[in-house]
Amino acid sequence: ALHLARLPLCAWTSFSALCRGIFRRFLTKRHMLDWVTDADSERFGAQGISFARDLFPLLCAVLLFFAPFTPARFFALFFLFAPVYCRLSEKPYKTNIAAPDEKDAEILTADAAAMWQYYTRFCNERNHFLPPDNVQETPVLRVAHRTSPTNIGMMLCSCLAARDLSLISSETLCEMLERTLDSVEKLPRWHGNLLNWYDTETLEALSPRFVSSVDSGNFLCCLTALSEGLSEYAPQCPKLWDVRARADALRASCDLSALYDWRRNLFYIGYDLEKNVFSDGRYDLLMSESRMMSYYAVASRQAPKKHWGALSRVMSRSGGYTGALAWSGTMFEFFMPYLFLESRENTLSFEALKYCVHCQRQFAAEKHIPFGISESG
């Protein structure tokens, strides 16, 4: 709709640029290298340019009103309201999420500090400073000495978050990241992608050896966030520049396109190294845990833009809410990518998140259980 509303303006701008280019090239031979950015043109001539932009769609609307055929009048009405529509669409986005007050901030920081103890306790020398997948507390304490690319990526980002919350110093952050990256660089990989599971005590890949597309995407997104965050603390601890370079090198070595089905424009679920075959299934829904991986792949040009359009947006309705569906409807599928991908209000992804919460709460109320069902149940 926005493109249609701006059609007269775009046509006029293109025609004007063409005429000026021909005039300067063949007649005046002057100002052929002049170029003014849109921001500068708005700053130096805001009133005149704004008036011209508003006037041209209105002029087209008036002319089309006198057209002899009815469809033209429809476009006339559309162009008539184009200036208002375009102005509203240009307003800067403002979030309605309120910041926690001082008391809530203290509670959240205390909870984060308690969660952080998981990494300080179990990312130890025995585990090669890699995060165990899980720890059983009862009836006996038992550590699962295995880890995945997602676990490792989240651990790296948790280190950065701990520094953001002043739970650790920049020097401690550097030390922890160096130790973990030392181990990651020793892990066997496939086309640069980490395998699905590793033994944290031996650093060997666990059988059956498998490369997960989603795990690879999660790891790459975590490395991207880590790299950006480290630039804030590197001036305090220059060694963090080297850590950042190592993270960037790991990211650059990963080839997601090796997991892409170019015929169907979808990502395979993964690659089985034991059988040397791709999995039969593919990630074909937008609202799934693979959304973050798909976004990264398109942004890094490891997958074409049409891949994003190939992801299905199957819709559903319940209790006045409408949203896109996931395969199993878990919180993990909907909200895991939200850790890194912003969902703005009145967008498809934002409405899908609201729809997920509504359905989860409705189901929990019927079954008299807490809401928030995820992969763990």
What is the role of each PLM region?
Residues 1, 38-41, 93-97, 315-317:
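Short acidic (Asp/Glu) and glycine-rich catalytic loops that position anionic groups and cofactors
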Residues 1-40, 106, 110-118:
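Membrane-proximal soluble regions of multi-pass membrane proteins
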Residues 1-15, 37-86:
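Alpha-helical bilayer-embedded segments of polytopic membrane proteins, i.e.
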Residues 13-31, 72-74, 81-102:
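Juxtamembrane/interface segments at transmembrane-helix termini
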Residues 46-55, 70, 74, 78, ...:
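Ser/Thr/Asn(+Pro)-rich, low-complexity disordered segments
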